[in-house]
Amino acid sequence: MLISHSDLNQQLKSAGIGFNATELHGFLSGLLCGGLKDQSWLPLLYQFSNDNHAYPTGLVQPVTELYEQISQTLSDVEGFTFELGLTEDENVFTQADSLSDWANQFLLGIGLAQPELAKEKGEIGEAVDDLQDICQLGYDEDDNEEELAEALEEIIEYVRTIAMLFYSHFNEGEIESKPVLH
């Protein structure tokens, strides 16, 4: 069974890891959406989240399971089951911060997997620009929480779509296609 967001957060914090669960999910998602297919994801994770030090043994398994679960949901393009690993907190301001954290680490991950990402044009280039804007998502504590929640829901769906766009673009031939029934 996949570890819960809060349990993963606690384990990362206890181990002194520089990422929270949301950032970890964003980073791993970025690597996968960027087309990384080998085992280099683990050394990259250690490098960018733990000063090149391996994670404690007890943390490697849940992180690997998370990586595999993200990979599986991304490959199911038709099912669109991929979800952003955002905080479970119901507070809309906390969720907005979580989305910004996820997007920041997603861009880092995809940038590592696709070093020429900044040169992409068209849909991909626009999506990169949009994600950079989302990373700087701002709000005022006086903002109407209901309106912010609605806007945030739309942005989250858009980011899910962007992730799937990147995955489809950089992982051609890897996408699971279901047979067409006649």
Swiss-Prot record:
The lineage's top-level taxon is: Bacteria
InterPro entries from the entry?
YgfB-like (IPR011978), YgfB-like_sf (IPR036255)
Classification via Pfam families? UPF0149
Q: Name one GO cellular component term.
A: cytosol
Similarity comment: Belongs to the UPF0149 family.
Q: What is this protein called?
A: UPF0149 protein HI_0817
